[in-house]
């Protein structure tokens, strides 16, 4: 039986145990594919499936707005003046920061959670791939620290994929260790890139 990590709840009017998400979505349901990001209001729920990629959630508890990204690599090298891409951690964070600036809310009032960075390859394969999961994790932690964000929780590393659900209304994030069969059920719709 796979290990299910604990949920990381924020204050919520929902009286169900924090380990089970609400049965019905409150509004817009968004699925993030690798390289996607989304920022929304209290009517938004954001889902994704992570392997070695990392997701960062940013949430404002009073305004009930927030976003999540799903990045593949820590940074792009070299950056040739191309438009920002959610495929890279530093650029995905900049895309979310643009949305936060548009709200007029102070950045330091947002709360962060870090999820993902599983080692999906054998140790000798990781050496050949420059250990992408570790670099992704280091990048996420560095950005949160540099921006002065409050880090509420992290669920990083390991060797199993994760299913993630972020409810912007409550700030709750549910994380489930995934099985291969579940990964094949990912929606094929696209969001922002």
From Swiss-Prot:
This is Probable chemoreceptor glutamine deamidase CheD 1. The lineage of its organism: Bacteria, Pseudomonadati, Pseudomonadota, Betaproteobacteria, Neisseriales. Its EC number is 3.5.1.44. PANTHER family: CHEMORECEPTOR GLUTAMINE DEAMIDASE CHED 1-RELATED, CHEMORECEPTOR GLUTAMINE DEAMIDASE CHED-RELATED. Probably deamidates glutamine residues to glutamate on methyl-accepting chemotaxis receptors (MCPs), playing an important role in chemotaxis. Keywords: Chemotaxis, Hydrolase. It catalyses: L-glutaminyl-[protein] + H2O = L-glutamyl-[protein] + NH4(+). GO terms for molecular function: protein-glutamine glutaminase activity. Residues 1-26 are annotated as: Disordered. InterPro entries: CheD-like_sf, Chemorcpt_Glu_NH3ase_CheD, Cytotoxic_necrot_fac-like_cat. It comes from Chromobacterium violaceum (strain ATCC 12472 / DSM 30191 / JCM 1249 / CCUG 213 / NBRC 12614 / NCIMB 9131 / NCTC 9757 / MK). Belongs to the CheD family. The keyword Hydrolase applies. GO terms for biological process: chemotaxis. Disulfide bonds: none annotated. Pfam families: CheD.
């Amino acid at each position: 039986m796979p290990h299910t990590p604990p949920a990381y709840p924020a204050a919520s009017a929902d009286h169900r145990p924090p380990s089970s998400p609400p049965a019905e979505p409150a509004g817009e349901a968004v699925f993030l594919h690798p390289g996607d990001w989304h920022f929304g209001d209290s009517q938004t729920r954001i889902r994704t499936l992570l392997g070695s990629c990392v997701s960062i959630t940013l949430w404002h508890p009073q305004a009930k707005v927030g976003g999540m990204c799903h990045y593949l690599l820590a940074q792009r090298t070299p950056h040739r003046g191309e438009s920002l891409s959610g495929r890279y951690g530093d650029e995905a964070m900049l895309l979310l920061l643009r949305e936060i600036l548009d709200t007029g809310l102070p950045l330091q009032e947002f709360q962060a959670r870090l999820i993902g960075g599983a080692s999906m390859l054998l140790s000798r394969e990781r050496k050949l791939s420059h250990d992408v999961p570790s670099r992704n994790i280091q990048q996420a932690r560095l950005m949160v620290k540099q921006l002065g964000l409050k880090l509420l929780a992290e669920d990083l590393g390991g060797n199993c994929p994760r299913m993630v659900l972020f409810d912007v209304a409550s700030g709750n994030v549910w994380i489930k260790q995934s099985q291969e069969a579940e990964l094949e059920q990912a929606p094929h719709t696209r969001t922002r890139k």
